[in-house]
Amino acid sequence: CWVETAFKDVTAGIKLRTRGFAPRLSDSEVITMEMVGEVLGHDGDEAIWAYFRRHWATWFPGLGDRSTFVRQAANLWRVKQLLHERLVVDVGARTADGHIIDGFPIAVCKLARAVRSQVLKAEAGYGYCAAKREYYYGLKAHLLIDLRGVAVGVTVTAANVDERDAAYDVLSAIEGLVLGDKGYIRPRFKADCEALGIDLQTPVRRNMKESRPRWWLMLLQRVRKRIETVISQLEQRFNLAKTRTRDVWHLTNQVTRKLLAHTMGVWLNLRLGREPLDLDGLLVA
């Protein structure tokens, strides 16, 4: 399968383990299970393990106890990043005609419990989500996609980090047209984007003069809805609107896994000539 072949390619020359025996369940099997589990809506490590233990144990005879599976999966976070990069390159998402950038919240706990929460205490912060018109405590994901909906990159910061400051991490490897919302308006940020070869297009605020033609503004508004769809899928199907992880290691694995699974779904749709973001239809195709 693709995972097995790509896994061998991206890990060529890399020694994943310095000692001990090879695991009974192969690393490529673990990643395959994670991706399938995520697409089916089983977003947590335990839920994915339980699903395959209950329904597909004969297909994965090496599947052992839950803690072993969770630890092995978390240790493969870097490999999953390399696999995601492989998909991005394969579909030409970095060199696409245009990209869209936006952020969304990842709650660590309910706002009322924030003072007592010890989960990701050094990384979390208080933030405001304009789309939901609510304050929250946790993290913020800054997502970049191409115009088809392929997730090119993501970076996660504390909720109180300005999205313009975080955007540099995901914009550094692309050029051309980038669509953003009003939150990305800042003269210095605009100038930095131009220096990187990026044409940043955003709506204007009420006190700003608009010189672009109306048809262009309507087109930008319509195209920007693509990232709203992707974020909605990540929040609902992949449950990325909150996290139950207690450390950066497992958080990194969780975010990477969900992004990889989503991108794999889009990749499959593109290969089948289907609507890229129709993940529901992919499951019954």
What are these regions (language model features)?
Residues 1-285:
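Short alpha-helical elements
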